[in-house]
């Protein structure tokens, strides 16, 4: 069959048109790339920091911390870590409990580089077992002595600076402790007097406390007993067999602890009902004094509970579940959340400074965060999923916030306000900067100006405080005028009337 004479030319025209379109498309793409050279960098953007405003809404923020490196066993030349569960920082040394490999890995930071210092798998001294089995935590004292939770060996070993055994802390031989129960120490801290506080698995009476001699001295910081009223009433009428099958009302357990510079114990728990977070009954972060009383200040707009929004995102939902805490020398503290892989920073009043981090496999993201520490201002996160330590360094923005808080605590309110002003130039949505300036003005006696800043961010408590002081100040400043006006309006007319009355009486006589 012969083709029509116009078919070939039409086909050729279409082909030429398509070629021109392809060339134009390529040129257009090239022009876009040239016009926006930063576009490819967006894929590597690590800005994932945020905070919450007065309304409880998520507000993006400049990064206060940025991830700059990760430390792995492979990079150190000793093979990968295996399920590491705890670590500790003292000066420029990092002590890692490489739990699955039954060893302690010591890492040294020198000239900004992290290098292997030594690997400890055994120690000397009079004991039947001088190796570790599943070590889960380590604490290093100021004297360079070590307390290691040798978990599977059911003991805490106290070693001197030469890795020689000093003593063992074992299950207390006390009537308050079930002598048939297992003793699996998981976390430990030691104060300057040698008092050791140990978190033991399935011990729900609080932390186990030992004297510096190794003698058991009791429990500290027992969690409040939580129970359901309906279950309680049901138990009153249930049979013995039914009661045995029901859940026993016991205090919930802690999951980690840390000492601050003043040797108060910060601790975390993730055993609570989510509704208890909303009315601030859960208290997932606590600060215990020597008596075990919670003294954590919670003056923020929202309690320190992590995320305020728990909706499903990327298959993750539910409240934040903190698994570790670390306290800085300026009384700010940080917690790591396993639910979404986030770090939350709070000031000494319980205000959220910022939150950052997420789940993932990139630098600065986490798989299964296990522990949190700090080295100077740097934050370090141990991840048992990624078998690595991620190091976060403070940014210039984060340093401004730290400086503002520190100067306020030192009583340098003018300087503190100046730092907060600089913060606002980088983040105009930062509520805490306005409140910080207001608090500085309040301390300086500039109550009227302080009221303006508190009003901007709906800080009713501080506004009320500033208003009362401003009213008192105003009255004190105007007291002369007030007395004068009172005398002129009330006293003077009465006095004039009295004088006239006397005068009339005298004239009548």
Residue ranges, per PLM feature:
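Short, Lys/Arg-enriched N-terminal segments with co-localized hydrophobic residues
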Residues: 4-17, 431
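C-terminal segment of classical bacterial N-terminal signal peptides
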Residues: 32-40
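Eukaryotic scaffold repeat domains enriched in small/polar residues
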Residues: 42-447, 457-458, 464-509
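Sec-dependent N-terminal signal peptides
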Residues: 21-31
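Positively charged, low-complexity intrinsically disordered regions
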Residues: 5-8, 21, 116, 205
């Amino acid at each position: 069959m012969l083709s029509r004479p116009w078919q070939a030319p039409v086909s050729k025209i279409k082909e030429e048109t398509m070629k021109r379109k392809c060339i134009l498309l390529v040129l257009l793409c090239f022009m876009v790339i040239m016009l926006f050279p930063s576009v490819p960098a967006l894929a590597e953007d690590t800005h994932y920091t945020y905070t919450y405003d007065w309304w409880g809404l998520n507000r993006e923020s400049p990064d206060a911390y940025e991830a700059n490196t990760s430390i792995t066993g492979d990079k150190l030349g000793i093979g990968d870590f295996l399920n590491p569960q705890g670590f500790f920082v003292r000066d420029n040394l990092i002590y890692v409990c490489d739990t699955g490999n039954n060893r302690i890995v010591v890492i040294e930071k020198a000239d900004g580089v992290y290098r292997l210092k030594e690997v400890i798998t055994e120690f000397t001294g009079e004991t039947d077992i001088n190796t570790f089995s599943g070590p889960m935590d380590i604490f290093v004292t100021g004297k360079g002595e070590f307390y290691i939770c040798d978990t599977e060996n059911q003991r805490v070993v106290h070693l001197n600076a030469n890795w020689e055994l000093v003593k063992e802390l074992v299950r207390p031989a006390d009537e308050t402790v079930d002598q048939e129960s297992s003793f699996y120490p998981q976390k430990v801290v030691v104060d300057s007097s040698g008092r050791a506080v140990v978190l033991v698995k399935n011990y729900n009476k609080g932390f186990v406390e030992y004297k510096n001699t190794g003698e058991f001295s009791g429990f500290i910081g027992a969690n409040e007993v939580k129970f359901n009223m309906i279950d309680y009433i049901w138990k009153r009428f249930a049979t013995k067999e039914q009661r045995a099958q029901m859940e026993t009302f016991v205090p919930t357990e802690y999951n980690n602890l840390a000492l601050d510079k003043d040797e108060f114990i910060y601790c975390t728990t993730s055993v609570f009902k989510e509704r208890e977070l909303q009315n601030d009954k859960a208290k997932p972060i606590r600060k215990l004094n020597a008596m075990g009383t919670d003294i954590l200040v919670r003056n923020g707009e929202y309690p320190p509970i992590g995320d305020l929004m728990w909706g499903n995102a990327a298959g993750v939902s539910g409240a934040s579940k903190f698994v570790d805490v670390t306290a800085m020398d300026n009384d700010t503290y940080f917690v790591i959340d396993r639910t979404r892989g986030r770090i939350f920073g709070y000031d000494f009043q319980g205000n959220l400074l910022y939150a950052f981090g997420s789940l993932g496999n990139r630098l600065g993201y986490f798989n299964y965060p296990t522990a949190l520490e700090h080295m100077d201002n740097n934050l370090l996160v141990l991840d048992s999923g990624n078998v690595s330590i991620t190091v976060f360094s403070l940014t210039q923005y984060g340093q401004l916030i730290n400086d503002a808080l520190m100067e306020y605590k030192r009583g340098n309110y003018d300087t503190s306000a100046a730092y907060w002003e600089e913060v606002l130039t980088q983040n105009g949505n930062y509520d805490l900067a306005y409140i910080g300036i207001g608090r500085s003005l309040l301390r300086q006696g500039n109550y009227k100006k302080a009221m303006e800043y508190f009003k901007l961010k709906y800080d009713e408590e501080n506004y009320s405080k500033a208003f009362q002081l401003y009213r008192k100040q105003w009255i004190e400043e105007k007291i002369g005028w007030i007395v004068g006006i009172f005398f002129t309006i009330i006293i003077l007319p009465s006095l004039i009337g009295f004088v006239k009355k006397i005068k009339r009486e005298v004239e009548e006589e």
